[in-house]
Amino acid sequence: MPHSEAFIRGPIRGPIRGLGPRSWGRVGRWSRIALGWCLLATVLQAEVRTGADALLAADPSPLRGRRVGLVTNPTGVTRDLESLALRLRQRKDFELVALYGPEHGVRGNAQAGDKVGFQWDPVLGLPLFSLYGKTFKPTGPMLTNIAGMVRGSPGIPTNAVLAERIDAMVFDIQDAGSRAYTYVGTLSKVMEACAEHGIPIWVLDRPNPLGGVVMEGPVLEAPEWVSLVGIQPIPMRHGMTVGELARLFNARFLARPAALTVLPLTGWSRSLEFAQTGLPWVMPSPNMPTLDTARVYPGQVLLEGTNLSEGRGTTRPFELFGAPWIQGRELTDALNALRLPGVVFREAWFTPSFSKHRGELCGGSQIHVTDAARFRSVTTTLRLLQTVRRLYPDRLTFQGPTFDRLMGTATVRPLLESGADLAPALARIEGDLKAFDALRQPHLLYP
């Protein structure tokens, strides 16, 4: 049954207060149409609850009596935008004793690639350990000797009450739906550390903002291209929630499985658009400001391995792209002539305030996704790179290791550099995606 039918049949019963037959006749035609769309939007919106909401509602709590660590960032909020860290800190039935932050930090303020050091949160009265600094993986002392590790560190009050260790780890971060987004790597590293130290981990599930049906891009070739932007052999667009990924990693990829519990979503299905969940979009990182960014990211992140600007240093990162030597109109016309599904390109000029081509006027385009269901980000970016090479063969360059690491394979870049046909490579990728789809099936939680 289509989602629209399923939702429309239930919630609206009887007349709408204040809009009887007589008053309805007095409402203008366009007002009736507008109201109709508003009502349709209301009934099509699901009542999705996250794993964080489930944890707070559980009575008794599964964390009762434990000293708890929390891996989180600004996306760790309830449906009502309350900080999960603050809510957990206020609990009396268990004790939140430490926070652990991925790339960009617990506070989400650090730029991409910037290392984050140890910090102290004076409001929560808790240590903030960085998992994107000297280490990507929680060390033994971070988990089992907290007081001994941090006491006397700058910024910590002399009277601070510090726990010795954690008895449980909680992971609550909104992913962006792409293998190259480092939070997936952090999840794997945290699970690995918890398994090594006998610490159970609870993963609080959140929706995949790109949905759970479509997969794209190569399945990463391991171990050759394993890194934090490709921690396990999964596709670039994996179509899984963090809870499902945790189950897959635990069953198939980790050398030592963790004591894993996933607190699932309620009300979410694989075909549900993020905008239909009723959940607020909180920036997962400084350069992921909107859902539009997340949609184009699985492909556009590949531009980090080229001399094209991927739009960092603008208010539309990954949607904008270009270079000082590109003529925006020429490139845009050539891209639109490809008639790629679900996307239109608009001529754009921009001057990045940081990152590649900082302070230089760049010609290029902005990606406008017109049909998210048909849009394929990875294929679009590969066609984009083919077009740039055809128009500017002496200007486009690739940073080999970076591009291959992001792509998860070294087989695609040489084809782009030489102008060869991508069709055989894309066909091979489709075959790998079918195999991965079969691999992931036992670990999926939602229809």
Language-model segments: which ranges?
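Glycine-rich, charge-decorated loop segments at or immediately adjacent to ligand/cofactor-binding or catalytic sites
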Residues: 107-112, 202-225
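Conserved anion/nucleotide-ligand pocket segment
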Residues: 225-297
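Glycine-rich, aromatic-lined ligand/substrate-binding cores of catalytic
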Residues: 268-348
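Conserved functional hotspot residues or short segments at active or partner-binding sites
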Residues: 322-428
